Amino acid sequence: MGRPAPRPLLLALLSLAVCRGRVVRVPAGTLVRVVGTELVIPCNVSDYDGPSEQNFDWSFSSSGSSFVELASTWEVGFPAQLYRERLQRGDILLRRTANDAVELHIKNVQPSDQGHYKCSTPSTDATVQGNYEDTVQVKVLADALVVGPSSRPPPGLSLREGEPFELRCIASTTSPLHTHLALRWELHRGPVHRSILALSHEGRFHPGPGYEQRYHSGDVRLDTVGSDAYRLSVARALSADQGSYRCVVSEWITEQGSWQEIQEKAVEVATVVIQPTALQLAVPRTVSVTEGKDLDLSCNITTDRVDDVRPEVTWYFKKTPDTSLLASHMLARLDRDSLVHSSPHVALSHVDTRSYHLLVRDVSKENSGYYLCLVALWAPGHNRSWHKVAEAMSAPSGVSVTWLEPEYQVYLNASKVPGFSDDPTELQCRVIDTKRLEAGVRLTVSWYYRMTRRNDDVVASELLAVMDGDWTLRYGERSKQRAQDGEFIFSKEHTDTFNFRIQRTTEEDRGNYYCVVSAWTRQRNNSWVKSKDVFSKPVNIFWASEDSVLVVKARQPKPFFAAGNTFEMTCKVSSKNIKSPRYSVLITAEKPVGDLSSPNETKYIISLDQDSVVKLENWTDASRVDGVVLEKVQEDEFRYRMYQTQVSDAGLYRCMVTAWSPIGGSLWREAATSLSNPIEIDFQTSGPTFNASVHSDTPSVTRGDLIKLFCIVTVEGAVLDPDDMAFDVSWFAVHSFGLDKAPVLLSSLDRKGVVTTGQRDWKSTVSLERVSVLEFLLQVHGSEDQDFGNYYCSVTPWVRSPTGSWQREAEIHSRPIFITVKMDVLNAFKYPLLIGVGLSTVIGLLSCLIGYCSSHWCCKKEVRETRRERRRLMSMEMD
């Protein structure tokens, strides 16, 4: 058996569910209102069924026994005839605040409205539960509140700023109930009104916005006088205090444990007019003072205030004549406590209470401008406070500072004039005939350059360098880099002498130069201000510009010689319009006209620079490293020798001479370059002529086969002994169908039998051998697809001369032969086919084995019944 449920708890829940129902509520307790005010009674309903919007009926009873219909939200004919006229006028109305709430408004409550008011709601519930009406009692009191000014009509007060004033308001009540009064002072200026100070019904003071500081300082106070007078006291009137003052009094009573305002009255007490304080300032219109003297400016004050006001005087300085303080500088200030705030050279004092003097000592030109006097009058307030009652700005006083500028002349001369390019130039700028050049004046210089034009076109000057008053030297764009490199030097020898030196004058430096000497005056803050500029007359830097001339003549002492002899050539140099020249020589060689081996090719052999340092250029004959000599015979003559000349040395030989001019120190400048006449080396011989050709029995091979290429040399003309001939053979290949790519070196064999093989990126290899005296065999082993292309050989013959020396002949080239490498289809597909057939056979056998195993072990069914038992089963079914 289970435990029985707790019966008391169930009964309590059931009772709560049964008791719950509609609840209509109006304010509890008694509502108290004053005759002539508005009565508002709220009513709401909760815990109801039916539509969300509920209707309300109001009834009134003066005694609480019988009620008269007053108003309804849903039935037009509900009100009694007694109240219909007031409903039509709007004195009585219902205002819905929510679907379940409504307010009854009765304007201008009368004593006859005192009684009981009942709020009821028609039923929309399924069952009648709860309360459908609620009643509240209203008491209407007579108007017992009396509010008024202390005098009628309201007075008009005319005050000056800073003067005190008082205003009084009479407020009292004879209400039979316990009520409190609250009072608030307001200031009205047109449509704007401000709360000044309020006394709440609980006896607390509340200053209005903007009056907090004045209230806490005691400047604005509120107190009572007697039993019914409230006094507003202002210790110091401000311009913002002008306007109409009203006294607002409200009466409060406690309802339902809280205070409720039951009526409010306001009365105009007084109109206050604040007269502005008259303040005028007078300063001198214009003042002229000599530089170095003292400036004295007066500011005279005129005002109608005779009470205890204190002036605050401030002097400002600015460069423009307007009266705004923008871009102005404060010079001195005398505060209301007579304390002066100024810089050391400025003083501010007052002769009497209405005249203030500004003294600026030792004025300079920077003190020229406009001076303004700003005066503010301060009146004492409550609790030792001060407030500003007037402020005025004077008209600007124009001050001009005259200066006796120094007098001097500037003279510019050229102490060094260049005769050639790269010569130095030196200019001297001197200051002469100085007058009134005091100790506080400093002289600086600026250098300018102007290009010389043959016509009358105006050319702008270019700044070279400028010196500031603090001796800082700044370079112009034209001279900045050269000055940093030390080519331009600016110096100051004496206080009146400035120098400008160009270490190496170029043709671009030709033109007019002039200097500008500036006078600078020291200011009080130790800064310097430019006061005067004096220009010198220009000095023209120019020299006759003639083109440099360099002539080189080459000659051959021995005009005819044979191969193996020594070749000698001398070069004579002459120059003009080149300063202190030194020469560098370069020997060049060109193939003679008609030589097709390397046409128009100039070869640099050996050189000698201006410091007589010899250098081999493109001399590549390793067997004759010491076979060429270049030496300096005289300052303008050079000799070139070539020992053991060969036939391949035939050509045109020249001397390329460059003249160098010193530019200072160990630096040189290239002045001119010239090429001598050619000296030809021509061997008058009837030697053999060599030709080269390429032959192959296998121009088309299958990949992997051997490629054989023969380079055959033929000799025409004179018959030579095989021991007197040797060859350098090189094989090249162009791996393309055309000759549009660069040739690749395959292998080379020099005349001494040394073989060199080029680097290859695939598996095939090459070999080169000499088959006979005039045949050379190139073999490509294990040919690949990349080995196709054009093949040719290059042959350099060497012939032994009668003197026993070997002479190098011109290099010859064979015509190319095209080699094709084909693919072997059978070999290419043999191994893939064998692999495919093998894999197919293995996969087929594996499939058969898997099928057999599956059918034997996995798919066989086990039969337990015998044939005889099956027959018996069939017999039973048939029976």
Curated annotation (Swiss-Prot):
Residues 1-21 form the signal peptide. The keyword Endoplasmic reticulum applies. InterPro entries: Ig-like_dom, Ig-like_dom_sf, Ig-like_fold, Ig_sub, Ig_V-set, IgSF_V-set/TM_domain. A motif (Endoplasmic reticulum retention signal) lies at residues 424-427. The chain crosses the membrane at residues 833-853. Coiled coil: none annotated. Residues 22-137, 149-263, 276-389, 406-536, 544-662, 688-813 form the Ig-like C2-type domain. This is Prostaglandin F2 receptor negative regulator.
